């Protein structure tokens, strides 16, 4: 496989080093987890692109894998044995050499971390799943250093998507030490509302990192955020803003995202939502048109539409009469009296958007005799609270980490570390396993069959395919390009000489 080698650069653009002293980003207020093994939010992944690097990294435009800590690799004839040749000039920020043993340490640390959402992606490696589940030793995991700069990895089955997978921050190379980084920047200062990154002088490609410093500020104050952007003290705004007060409308970057927002049931023995018939009743009664009103791209399925991916039957119609019949049947299956009250709990982030959507469901489900209790959780705590929350229904917005249906379907694999729903289906898992052995048309056909099983089991309510929203003046900033993952590697950013001037506004430098 030939990977892209050229760094992102703007054609014939001369970069002025005098402008690169500081680049200011405002991001949403959040308890940021900057451990690449346990980070789950896309906003965390964005920062991690500047702090850590793995064998591959994202091309900032195409998102194809670029060589990072490797300079080449080869794959055996049976496609199961991968040999990676590491760069011999790569160092950690403390000046120590990065070797194949560091990759082994990093991946084994990821696999054995119970809080690592992405660790099950490495189950494709011999011995990894057993080690993750505590059923086998680390020595049996087929990640082996041949020498200081050669790494051998043995897979259970072919996985042509492996380089794309290894672009993700979770598979970065880390050192067993505090504040040591493998990427283009290091953390210089950190407070509750600010993180300052400094250029990593020991980074192997430091000469192509233009910014000397990046200041990350965290704020959900839309008026203040917009004001600071308007006067030029902020270079990139990716938090809340006031569109009416935004002076430079050309700065609004709105693009389709490889993502889906959906609600899902958590399967718990003590919950009535473990009953399939009741879940089917709730989905039959859902007013899909109202639920998807005022969204950019309505979603009726989980997987974002991809070329070559067969259509599956999603959720598009409402039938309250059928829903009422199903509720009666569900009560019999649950051994409840016909007059028994049915209550389920929906835990949501405390945002105006989600409160409105939850009220739509509450009203609709009340008409079929089901009471929906709505519980709010602070937005910045929501994702981490799901595993320990006793609610029945939750909301998720998932951005695919690589361009394959598996990026979504892995969320519901029975033993996946990303499966927070606790739904399990052996036929579904088997189809995912078979798809890993297949390519192209057959691969997609198997995965679409798996998705149909998931949808038929009424475990989720697809709502929308979100769009990414960023405020950034591309006449003033280079190295930034819209893409389907809304990931913009910090390494490539730089300030341009030209900057749009807005009448009657003093631009602060």
Regions found by a protein language model. Give the residues of each.
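Long beta-strand-rich cores associated with HINT superfamily self-processing modules
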Residues: 470-509
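Aromatic- and charge-enriched surface segment that lines or borders ligand/interaction sites
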Residues: 71-119, 272-274
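N-terminal lobe/hinge region of extracytoplasmic solute-binding protein
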Residues: 26-77, 108
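Surface-exposed binding/hinge segments that line
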Residues: 102, 111-112, 117-174
């Amino acid at each position: 496989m030939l990977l892209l080698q050229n760094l992102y650069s703007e054609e014939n653009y001369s970069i002025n080093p005098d402008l690169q002293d500081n680049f200011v980003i405002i991001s949403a207020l959040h308890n940021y987890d900057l451990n690449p093994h346990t980070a789950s939010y896309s906003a965390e992944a964005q920062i991690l692109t500047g702090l850590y690097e793995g064998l591959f990294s994202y091309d900032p435009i195409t998102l194809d894998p670029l060589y990072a800590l490797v300079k080449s690799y080869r794959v055996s004839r049976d496609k199961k044995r991968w040999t990676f040749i590491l760069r011999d000039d790569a160092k950690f920020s403390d000046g120590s050499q990065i070797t194949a043993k560091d990759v082994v340490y990093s991946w084994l640390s990821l696999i054995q971390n119970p809080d690592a959402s992405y660790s099950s992606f490495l189950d494709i490696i011999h011995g990894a799943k057993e080690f993750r589940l505590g059923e086998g030793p680390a020595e049996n995991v087929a990640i082996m250093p041949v020498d200081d700069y050669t790494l051998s990895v043995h897979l259970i089955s072919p996985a042509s998507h492996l380089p794309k997978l290894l672009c993700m921050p979770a598979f970065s190379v880390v050192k067993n030490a505090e504040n040591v980084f493998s990427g283009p920047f290091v953390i210089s200062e950190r407070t509750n509302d600010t993180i300052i990154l400094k250029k990593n002088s020991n980074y192997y490609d430091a000469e192509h990192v233009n910014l000397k410093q990046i200041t990350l500020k965290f704020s959900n104050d839309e008026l203040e955020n917009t004001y600071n952007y308007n006067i030029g003290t902020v270079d990139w705004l990716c938090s809340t803003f006031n569109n009416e007060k935004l002076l430079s409308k050309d700065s609004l970057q709105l693009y389709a995202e490889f993502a889906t927002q959906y609600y899902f049931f958590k399967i718990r023995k003590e919950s009535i939502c473990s009953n399939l018939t009741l879940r089917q009743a709730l989905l039959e009664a859902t007013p899909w048109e109202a639920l998807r009103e005022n969204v950019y791209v309505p979603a009726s399925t989980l997987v974002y539409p991809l070329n070559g991916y067969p259509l599956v039957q999603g959720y598009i119609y409402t039938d309250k009469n059928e829903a009422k019949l199903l509720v009666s049947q569900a009560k019999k299956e649950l051994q409840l009296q016909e007059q028994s009250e049915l209550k389920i709990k929906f835990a949501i982030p405390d945002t105006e958007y989600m409160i409105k959507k939850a009220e739509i469901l509450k009203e609709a489900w009340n008409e079929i005799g089901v009471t929906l209790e709505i519980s709010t959780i602070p937005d910045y705590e929501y994702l981490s609270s799901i595993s320990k929350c006793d609610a029945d229904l939750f909301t998720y917005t998932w951005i695919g980490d690589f361009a394959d249906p598996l990026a979504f379907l892995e969320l519901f694999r029975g033993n996946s570390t990303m499966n927070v729903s606790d739904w399990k289906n052996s036929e579904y898992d088997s189809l995912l396993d078979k798809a890993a052995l297949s390519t192209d048309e057959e691969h997609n056909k198997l995965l679409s069959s798996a998705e149909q099983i998931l949808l038929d089991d009424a475990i989720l309510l697809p709502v929308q395919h979100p769009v990414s929203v960023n405020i950034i003046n591309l006449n003033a900033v280079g190295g930034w390009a819209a893409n389907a993952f809304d990931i913009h590697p910090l390494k490539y950013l730089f300030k341009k000489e030209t900057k749009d001037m807005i009448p009657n506004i003093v631009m602060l430098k």
